[in-house]
Curated annotation (Swiss-Prot):
Region annotation (G2) ranges: 60-64
Organism: Mycoplasmoides gallisepticum (strain R(low / passage 15 / clone 2)) (Mycoplasma gallisepticum)
Region (G5): 174-176
Binding site for Mg(2+): T26
Entry EC number(s): 3.6.5.3
Family annotation (InterPro entries): EF-Tu_GTP-bd, EF-Tu_GTPase, EFTu-like_2, EFTU_2, G_TR_CS, P-loop_NTPase, Small_GTP-bd, T_Tr_GTP-bd_dom
Protein's name according to its UniProt entry: Elongation factor Tu
Residue ranges, annotated region (G1): 19-26
Gene Ontology terms, MF aspect: GTP binding; GTPase activity; translation elongation factor activity
Localization of this protein: Cytoplasm
GO cellular component terms attached to this protein's record: cytosol
């Protein structure tokens, strides 16, 4: 089995195919798996296996996504492909499948289309750092001048959304040709993966980022002090280090006097651990669910921010009606709901269920957040939308 050969010592990168409907995203995903399977670093996948994407839930929203994995000489990749446009929007905004980079698929027969633009904008908003372009269907649109024009158009489009359009690699190929085993087109898949290897940066591992733990619960241990519990979101923490309690009340620094996991004492807690953190000189009433413990200076509390949001459709459990300027739902960050008001961008009268749009949010109390923080929008405990912080304002 090809599966045995995955080498976990290679750097891991999360990637995804984006682009307009029917431009060949899923065919390309299948082609990458199939071509790399011949080199023994992937399992061959048929189009239908990828297209029948299973449902998953993220932040209370159902999304269809297909996950495949493959490796090149240099890296291990987890690749996400979504069957429908709405799934892409939801996926990017909820961060259900984190993307460290994207493969933008554009058909050479059509050029950039409305969803091409929308996906580029979303990628920009949610912080996808770089993309590689695959100009697909070059076996059909085989006029080099036409391909040249489409390539220029894509580069200009990338530039208009703040990507480096001049230096973005553009590979001209045919996903279907490669899937059918035509050597010239298979070579283009190798060329694409080489560009992805070289152009898309390796992300920092979660463990190497500044420490952050969202507080889920607090308790007092007689004679020892206050313990907060939660799952470490990123970074690592050692006994004796200082952390800040951020959000809701004024930020304060405290010293960690103990770390426990499954009733065992530890020297350190790392990303992914569910841990209890013992804090020196803190009263239980001074800490609460919804705050975070963080490396001092790494994250600050904010009340006002710009965000990109998706409003759930009625059949997804969302609202039945549009919401207007001044709408006041709850914003669920990590472990808690905070009420806030929504200001729509100029020229937007209302937000209909199923829309995605940019808004400004003002919360009633400050919460630890930064560019890229994810949240749900809730109304009486049910999720009616999801969002990503694009920029903190105050």
């Amino acid at each position: 089995m090809a599966k045995e050969r995955f080498d976990r010592s290679k750097p891991h990168v999360n990637i995804g195919t984006i682009g307009h409907i029917d431009h060949g995203k899923t065919t390309l995903t299948a082609a990458i798996c199939t071509v790399l399977s011949k080199a023994g670093t992937s399992e061959a996948k048929k189009y239908d296996e990828i297209d029948a994407a299973p449902e998953e839930k993220a932040r209370g929203i159902t999304i269809n996504t297909a996950h495949v994995e493959y490796a090149t000489q240099n890296r291990h990749y987890a690749h996400v492909d979504c069957p429908g446009h709405a799934d892409y929007v939801k996926n990017m905004i909820t961060g259900a499948a984190q993307m460290d980079g994207g493969i933008l698929v554009v058909s050479a027969t059509d050029g950039p289309m409305p969803q091409t633009r929308e996906h580029i904008l979303l990628a920009r908003q949610v912080g996808v750092p770089k993309m590689v372009v695959f100009l697909n269907k070059c076996d059909v649109a085989d006029d080099p001048e036409m391909q040249e024009l489409v390539e220029m158009e894509v580069r200009d489009l990338l530039k208009s959304y703040g990507f480096d359009g001049d230096n973005t690699p553009v590979i001209r190929g045919s996903a279907l040709g490669a899937l059918n085993g035509e050597p010239a087109w298979e070579e283009k898949i190798h060329e694409l993966m080489k560009a992805v290897d070289e152009y898309i940066p390796t992300p920092d591992r979660e463990v190497d980022k500044p420490f952050l733990l969202p507080i889920e619960d607090t308790m007092t241990i007689t004679g020892r002090g206050t313990v907060v519990t939660g799952r470490v979101e990123r970074g690592q923490l050692k006994v004796g280090e200082e952390v800040e309690i951020v959000g809701i009340t004024d930020t304060r620094k405290v010293v960690v006097t103990g770390i426990e996991m499954f009733r065992k004492e530890l020297d350190a807690a790392m990303a992914g651990d569910n841990a209890g953190i013992l804090l020196r000189g803190v009263d239980r009433k001074d800490v609460q669910r919804g705050q975070v413990l963080a490396k001092p200076g790494s994250i600050t509390p904010h009340k006002k921010f710009r965000a990109e949001i998706y409003a759930l459709k009625k059949d997804e459990g969302g609202r039945h009606t549009a919401f207007l300027n001044g709408y006041r739902p709850q914003f669920y960050f990590r472990t808690t709901d905070v009420t806030g008001s929504i200001q729509l961008k100029e020229g937007t009268e209302m937000v209909m269920p199923g829309d995605n749009t940019e808004i400004i949010v003002e919360l009633i109390s400050s919460i630890a957040c930064e560019k890229g923080s994810k949240f749900s929008i809730r109304e009486g405990g049910r999720t009616v939308g999801a969002g990503t912080v694009v920029e903190v304002l105050e």
